[in-house]
Amino acid sequence: MRELTYVARRTAEWREAPDPVLQSDSDAIVAPVAAAPCDVDSAILAGHGPIPPPFAIGHECVARVVDAGESSRFSPGNLVVVPWAISCGTCDRCAGGLTTHCTSVPHMAMFGAPIGGSWGGLFSDLVRIPWADAMLVPLPGGLDPMAMASASDNWPLAWRLVAPHLRARPGARVLVIARGSIGLYVCDIARALGASDVLYVDPDPAHRAIAEGYGARTAAEIEPVHHGFDLAVESTGRVPELVTALRSLAPEGFCESAGNHFRPGELPLLEMYLTGVTLRVARDNVRAHLPQALELAASGQVDPGRVVSGVFDWEQLPEVLPERHLKPVFVRADQPVGR
């Protein structure tokens, strides 16, 4: 089989690799049918990753099961979402919902970067899934795999960034400072779940147009809005934008940072203390809440497909992926996306 391999800044190529095989009765082998890059893939291709090349990349896809171990509930032909992080489903952390911190594998075990072991990437023709019953989630009927290619990471991450807060604070005012798909998904979800106001901040006019289609107000940039928002979501990876988000919170407000902060910076800690700000900077435990996020996607209240910026053939991955796109989706001619 082939796997898309990151080899240098803005450069990826197909490389041959052995076909994966079942290593236990709980494994599955899947073939991605619709895959997309996330913010981490973009950072890696831009040369910001912590691991030097070469390595297989990609950690967002909807896939079709092609083989499964005897103890697995999955069968060949099933359409499934593959979470980006490796998790066993039974250790204390997995049982507590901390699936990104599974103790059965090395810290940071994931698809798309050999940080906690080598698990391959989801831009590969075939992928072995350990603990398939714990990891894989069936794609609900009626959902388009192309629209949900980011259900491995960015879509359920966006759900987690806003849905629990709106449950705790119905009608909350939401500020989103972003540069792409995560922030746009947040706008869609926030409006669907009853946010009274959503302001999306992004210098890209095309991104702002999508946010406006979701019912958000938009701006290219802002100064801090004193006590303006109950929840702020930052997904730029830029500390100045994070500071703006923090300084815009109302008393006892919450800031979720989903940016990959590769550069250091200072935070306004005294202001945060005086306002009563809670800041969370974290990788997402996707598998724990993926079923809830997919349930919302299947409800018809949201439209994640609007964020898809183009659909491309699988063979175009080496040429198209290094280019700057909002959310390109790559599909396989040999693995139809239909059920």
Model-derived regions, located:
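Short N-terminal strand-loop motif that marks the start
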Residues: 1-62, 124-127, 131, 333-339
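Glycine-rich beta-strand-centered segment in the early N-terminal region that forms part
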Residues: 20-35, 48-95, 120, 140
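Mid-domain Rossmann-like dinucleotide-binding core that forms the NAD(H)/NADP(H) cofactor-binding site
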Residues: 79, 138-221
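NAD(P)H dinucleotide-binding glycine-rich loop of Rossmann-like/cofactor-binding domains
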Residues: 90-177
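Glycine-rich phosphate-binding loop and adjacent beta-alpha segment
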Residues: 195, 239-299, 332-339
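Short, well-ordered loop/turn sites that connect or cap secondary structure elements
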Residues: 74-75, 168, 249
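A short acidic, Gly/Pro-enriched loop at the edge of an enzyme's catalytic core
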Residues: 224-232
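C-terminal hydrophobic helical "lid"/dimerization subdomain
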Residues: 1-3, 287-339
